[in-house]
UniProtKB/Swiss-Prot annotation:
Main location: mitochondrion
Gene Ontology CC terms, in alphabetical order: mitochondrial crista; mitochondrion; respiratory chain complex IV
Subcellular location(s) per record: Mitochondrion inner membrane
Organism: Rattus norvegicus (Rat)
Tissue and organ distribution: Testis specific.
Organism lineage string: Eukaryota, Metazoa, Chordata, Craniata, Vertebrata
This protein's name: Cytochrome c oxidase subunit 6B2
Disordered, as annotated region: 1-21
Amino acid sequence: MLGVQAQMPAPGQWTTPPFDPRFPNQNQTRNCYQNFLDYHRCVKTMDRRGKNTQACDYYFRVFHSLCPVSWVQRWNEQIKQGTFPGKI
């Protein structure tokens, strides 16, 4: 986990996400969606264990860099309404 922390820029400085070997193709739609899921799963797990969610910030930064704002807003609304199709 130390390697991930070393890659994170200071708050407010957004950079291009590093290469993820799970998504080698140019189309990054799946990468966006997977990092959105990973972030919410991480937050849920850390909250359940009573730990700090700062470790989840990496996923937050990646999906905010890759995903269109309209998608994120729609997914967050679906989560609040209980209609989000992904497993969190």
